[in-house]
Structures are given as C-alpha cells and as structure tokens.
Amino acid sequence: MIIVLSPAKSLDYETPAHVQSYTQPAFVDDASELIAGLRKLSPQDIATLMDISDPLARLNYQRYADWSPIFTPANSKQAVLAFNGDVYEGFDAKSLSAADLDYAQQHVRVLSGLYGLLRPLDLLQPYRLEMGTRFANTRGKDLYAFWGDRITRALNEQLETRRGASRVLINCASTEYFKSVKPKLLAAPVITPVFEDWKGGRYKIISFHAKRARGLMARYVVENRIAEPKALQAFAMEGYAFDAAASNDSTYVYRRRVGE
C-alpha cells in the first residue's frame, strides 16, 4: 500500500528536526530544470503567475535564487517535517517515532509541483510551486505537461514490489495534485477516502476538516502498520466513521456528525 498526500504551502524551517536520518529526493535534475525557468521571472512575474502578494513573491524569488541541486541538512529539512499545513497538522510527523517514520518512508508519498514525488524523509529546500500553476516550461504549457507520466512511473516502481491486496494506491491528495498521476497507467487500483461533516442538514466536504482528516488517515496507516485497504474501514479518529452504504470499492466515505 502507498498513500499519497498533497504538499503544503506553509513551511516550517524553524523547529529543529527530531530525527537525524534523511534521504535525497529522486527528481533533483527535473527540479533543477524548473528552477532554471523560475529564475528568469521577476518578483512581479511571480506575483502574477501565482496570484500572491508582493512580499510573498519576493520571498520566493529569493528562494529560487538560493536553491541548490545539492541537498544537505544545512539548506534543507525532511519533507514531512518541513510541510506545515492542515494535512500535516493531522499527520503530526514531529510526534512520530523513528520507527514510525521508517514505516512512513516505505508507504507515504507526497506529490509536489517542484519535486515531483517525495518520500517523507527526503530533504526539501523551501519553495512555492503549486501543481496547478500554469507555468510554461521546456516540456509544455504547465506542470502536468512537465511531469507527464514520470510520477506515475515512479509510483509503479514502488507498487510493483507489493503483493496481493497490499498493491493499492490510497489517494489522500487534492484533485489538483492527483491530476499529476495517471490512474489508467498505474499498476494498482486506487482508493480515495472522502471525509464529510454534517452541516446545514446534510453531509458535505468541508475543506479544512477534509485536509486535516487526510493527514489523520496517513497517520493511522503509519501507526497501525496498515498494509491492506480493508483495514482502513476501521479508521475512527476525531469522530469520523466509515459509512459502508455511501462507499464503494474505489471510494471510502467517512462521516462525522457533531451536534446539530
């Protein structure tokens, strides 16, 4: 089983990492190619392209200038400890043991506009480049064209080492990021967990809660050493419960009703 997550725009390079082990990202050459293109942009170009404020554009202009193809603990941090958004608050990697992170290294992957596909302990230099950004590059009009089937092929290499029911991809990424994966070319079925909260008289996906729940699901997989998808149906963190009637073989629906 492999579970894929989206990255986070918010990053934490202030908190010291609680583990020393790290690995190198697989797609450094590809990232270098993107950085070369990004370095041609002015801060104003970046602000327009990414629809961000001028201060944030200047910050990322400097990040691209500082970026190095050599990753060390001095200029980088393990990806799952550097990302700091809603998903990663749910995953809470800083409270996982070294053994937990070792299991995560085998079973969790993060999709990235700049880095393609990351393992939890892959070193990460700070950046901003969302997968949906229409950044024209040497391979096409956007990042989906740039990555093509590279991410899918990398996932297949890892999925093909799994056997039986454990050869499955659990999609806990956003639609924007999962578009970088080509399910028809995957060597495994895809199961997408969906998290719904009761609001306004019906169950609906509430973005903030759903993002956090995806991180909680990844943590559940890691802490419980889950290898087969049926075991995911027992997930019940923070009030969510599996709804068999609303689910099917490719979509697992979890619902939560807190008050009225």
UniProtKB/Swiss-Prot annotation:
Record-level GO BP terms: response to hydroperoxide
InterPro entries referenced in this protein's UniProt entry, alphabetically: YaaA
Pfam families xrefs: H2O2_YaaD
Top-rank taxon: Bacteria
Any single GO CC term annotated in Swiss-Prot or TrEMBL for this entry: cytosol
Cited HAMAP family: UPF0246 (MF_00652)
Database matches in NCBIfam families: PRK02101.1-1, PRK02101.1-3
Similarity-based family: Belongs to the UPF0246 family.
Protein name in UniProt: UPF0246 protein Bmul_1054/BMULJ_02209
Organism encoding this protein: Burkholderia multivorans (strain ATCC 17616 / 249)
